[in-house]
Amino acid sequence: MENRSLIKKVLETDPAARYALNVIINYPGVHAMFCYRINSFLWKKLHLKFLARMFSQIARFFTGIEIHPGATIGKRLFIDHGMGVVIGETTIIGDDCVLYQGVTLGGVGTGEHKVKRHPTLLNNVMVSAGAKVIGDVTIGNNRIIGAQTVVLKDVPDNCTVVGVPAFIVKENGVKVKKEL
């Protein structure tokens, strides 16, 4: 069921996606999500962590997209032009999000301590090409992260952020220029 809703989202979102078979065969972001769902099941339900990690690395080899099987991903994540996308172990992604090429949802720390060290994206978040969201930060609902932006702090709902470091350029549909 999740696979069908993802394919439907791709068809609605990407003007180049003209029919379902094209999406199934030619979209590495869709392949990566199919693999993630299996690997996540192995990791979280069956506790076959080595096997899940091994399969996730095989998926990375074929798709260019690295999704840790320990990540929590909601419905209809569309990874478009996904080469170089990295999604870390404690990342949480809500429903209806879009990631473009080169996006990193990365962690801070070494992983020695079992704490949340990767970002949380709530629902309907678009992270543009090359953007980096680093650490245990929360990106609120209905957000746009501009290309090449570096986000190190929480981002409130209904806004657009750009820059290094990120700052707000649109909030609730109104142009602004505010620090995070």
Regions found by a protein language model. Name each.
Residues M1-A59, T63, V174-L180:
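Terminal amphipathic alpha-helical/low-complexity segments used for targeting or macromolecular assembly
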Residues G29, L46, H68, G88, ...:
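Residues at secondary-structure transition points
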Residues L51, F55, V98-Y100, G109-E112:
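Extended, non-globular alpha-helical segments
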Residues T63, H68-P69, G74-K75, D80-E89, ...:
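Left-handed beta-helix
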Residues C159-K178:
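Conserved beta-strand-loop-alpha-helix hinge in the C-terminal portion
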